[in-house]
Amino acid sequence: MDHIGVVVDDLAAAIEFFVALGLEAQDRQLVEGESVDRMMSLGGARFERAFVRTPDGHGWLELVEFHSPPYTGERSLEPSNAPGIRYVTFVVDDLDAVLSDIREHGAELVGEVQNYENIDKLCFIRGPAGIIVELAERLG
């Protein structure tokens, strides 16, 4: 796997959110052109993107904010059990500290923080554009 693409409505806020989780922001880039239109099957596609990567350099997210064409469909916040790509997980050293910091960037808990069999301390939060992010603190 190379990276995961996440479409957001506010690229700057999404970058801040993932940087607060410990990822490293890379350069932003404006993308447009006929090849993009044809690949995405969108007319007049124009978007700005930025990659954020895990500190070890092995995991990448491509954050994308479309300028055109505008999205006109309905937006829903799917529950954790809906089919499809549902969440991305990050291992953190101190879940409580990360939660405290990330709430300043608009994150909200989906459920409750849980101790899973004394192996992991886990929670789901909603991040930019309603995506679910799982935070995991290894306990053992």
Language model: regions and residue ranges:
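Core segments of cupin and vicinal oxygen chelate
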Residues: 7-58, 97, 104, 123-126
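Short loop/turn motifs at secondary-structure junctions and domain boundaries
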Residues: 42-44, 114-117
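A short acidic/small-residue loop/turn micro-motif
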Residues: 68, 117, 139-140
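Short, basic/aromatic recognition patches
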Residues: 107-114
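A cross-kingdom feature marking solvent-exposed beta-strand/loop segments within repeated
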Residues: 33-39, 71-74, 116
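Conserved SAM-binding loop
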Residues: 135-137
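Vicinal oxygen chelate
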Residues: 1-9, 50-67, 74-101, 121-126, ...
